[in-house]
């Protein structure tokens, strides 16, 4: 069972991890929320380092860049490829072909710049409030969302791909275990506060369904790039709602 954790850490992070990979890569999906917690914990440490010198802007930059370096930019690359393929390809085949191109186009560049700036602004607000649990929650929920997408949508490429080994055997057991783990970790990180936990969970679900709907419409399934983009967009959505919660917007609406 721990071999699944090894595979999950090697897949989602650049951390040097000893041990053997799982025989079935899909077994690593059970561990995605836990790896999200590891990533979130490291990102939080970087944010705390920036706040330790009283510099929220530095804290947000360290958290953002640290997350990118820790994940080798894997999810960000998926976001760029998704934007290029979905908005640059007029047909399913064209979209899949563009997504496989290692070069980043104009749509991909715009998506990366926009989402990274957006995340930096949210992280700045969260760092100022020292809402470290909410920062980590974004990392946990975004990796949990990847499992849900992999378990409920077919793989789009007939010629295989890097994510096919994870998606082809994914099913309800992976979805249920990851969902329960992700929700429990969310509540723990937010000190069992019901209202903010439900709001962040709502944001992650909306972003997840949006990515799933768009991917189904454009290519009829998912790829590794879609899973990476899902992680980036869910994380951004969670951090946005966390920042809005801290600014009291939901109380103002109520």
From Swiss-Prot:
Any idea what this protein is called? Adenosylcobinamide-GDP ribazoletransferase
- Enzymatic class: transferase
Q: Which GO terms describe its biological process?
A: cobalamin biosynthetic process
What this protein catalyses is: alpha-ribazole + adenosylcob(III)inamide-GDP = adenosylcob(III)alamin + GMP + H(+); alpha-ribazole 5'-phosphate + adenosylcob(III)inamide-GDP = adenosylcob(III)alamin 5'-phosphate + GMP + H(+)
Q: What does this protein do?
A: Joins adenosylcobinamide-GDP and alpha-ribazole to generate adenosylcobalamin (Ado-cobalamin). Also synthesizes adenosylcobalamin 5'-phosphate from adenosylcobinamide-GDP and alpha-ribazole 5'-phosphate.
Q: Which gene encodes it?
A: cobS
Q: What cofactor does this chain's UniProt record say it requires?
A: Mg(2+)
Chief place where the protein resides: membrane
Q: Where in the cell is it found?
A: Cell inner membrane
């Amino acid at each position: 069972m721990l071999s699944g954790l090894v595979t999950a850490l090697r897949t989602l992070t650049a951390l040097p991890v000893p041990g053997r990979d799982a025989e079935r890569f899909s077994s690593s999906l059970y561990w995605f929320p836990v790896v999200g917690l590891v990533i979130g914990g490291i990102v939080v440490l970087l944010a705390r380092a920036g706040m330790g010198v009283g510099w929220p802007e530095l804290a947000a930059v360290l958290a953002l860049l640290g997350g990118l370096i820790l994940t080798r930019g894997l999810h960000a690359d998926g976001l760029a490829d998704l934007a290029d393929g979905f908005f640059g390809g007029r047909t399913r085949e064209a979209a899949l072909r563009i997504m496989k191109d290692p070069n980043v186009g104009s749509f991909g560049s715009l998506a990366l710049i926009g989402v990274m700036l957006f995340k930096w602004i949210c992280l700045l607000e969260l760092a100022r409030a020292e809402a470290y649990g909410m920062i980590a929650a974004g990392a946990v929920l975004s990796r949990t969302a990847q499992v849900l997408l992999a378990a409920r949508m077919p793989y789009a490429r007939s010629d295989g791909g890097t994510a096919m080994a994870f998606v082809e055997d994914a099913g309800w057991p992976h979805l249920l275990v990851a969902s329960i783990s992700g929700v429990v970790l969310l509540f723990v990180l937010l000190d069992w506060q019901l209202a903010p936990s439900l709001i962040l969970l709502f944001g992650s679900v909306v972003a997840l369904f949006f990515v799933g709907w768009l991917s189904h419409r454009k290519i009829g399934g998912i790829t590794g790039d879609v899973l990476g983009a899902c992680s980036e967009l869910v994380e951004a959505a969670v951090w946005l709602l966390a920042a809005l919660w801290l600014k009291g917007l939901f109380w103002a609406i109520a």
